[in-house]
Amino acid sequence: MKKITKTLSLGFILFLLSSAPFSLNAEIKLPVIFSDNMVLQQQTDAAIWGWANPNTPVRVTTSWDRKSYTAKSDGEGRWKLKVKTPAAGYTPYTITISDGKSVTLQNILIGEIW
């Protein structure tokens, strides 16, 4: 019984470590829900979050209004901010997230999310 418990504990710890967002090169990391071809809720303050180096300024720029939003990552590298979204439409947009290195999400649509 102890061997099974140790094996399950070790497997769980390895799973947690492999799913944690580690970065050695100052690159923005985003949860899998943020990607190319996503849809954001129209006319709201949409939350965007991720990981960067600890205590680093992060800038998010949206193409629909060319506005930049800023946040600072905490001591563990986590950051979060909200962006205003426009009315629904068929125009694809981009979101660029940067902490010195940029990540651009493309083909973002705005609409109703149920």
Regions found by a protein language model. Give the residues of each.
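Non-catalytic, glycine-rich low-complexity segments
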Residues: 25-54, 108-114
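A generic short-segment signal for beta-strand/edge and adjacent turn/coil regions
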Residues: 18, 27-30, 64
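Bacterial N-terminal signal peptides
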Residues: 9-20
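Positively charged n-region of N-terminal signal peptides that target proteins for export
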Residues: 1-7
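Extended acidic/polar, glycine-enriched regions
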Residues: 49, 53-114
